[in-house]
Amino acid sequence: MLSIELCVSSLEAIALAKELKVDRVEVCQNLESGGLTPSVSLVESAIDSGLKTHVLIRPRVGGFIYSESELELILREISFFNKMGVHGVVIG
């Protein structure tokens, strides 16, 4: 069975995803820069909508080779969003 995921970066996009009955959303910000980790409140809104919610974890624009401190930040964000109740995370 085909699953449909919609990248969302606003409250309006979350509402549209719910209206379209997509299988899940990927919450992110700054899509014009390739996407970054979204705000906590936007992720909360996606979870509260009842949609299956995945969160993009990307601390900065640019390449995907991270320093030790960036990797520590990524791990903390994954743990935090997991405790919030997201269904998964997206890296890259």
Label every PLM stretch briefly.
Residues 3-31, 48-49, 67-91:
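Alpha/beta enzyme core
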Residues 35-61:
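Alpha-helix-loop-beta-strand connector modules within alpha/beta enzyme cores
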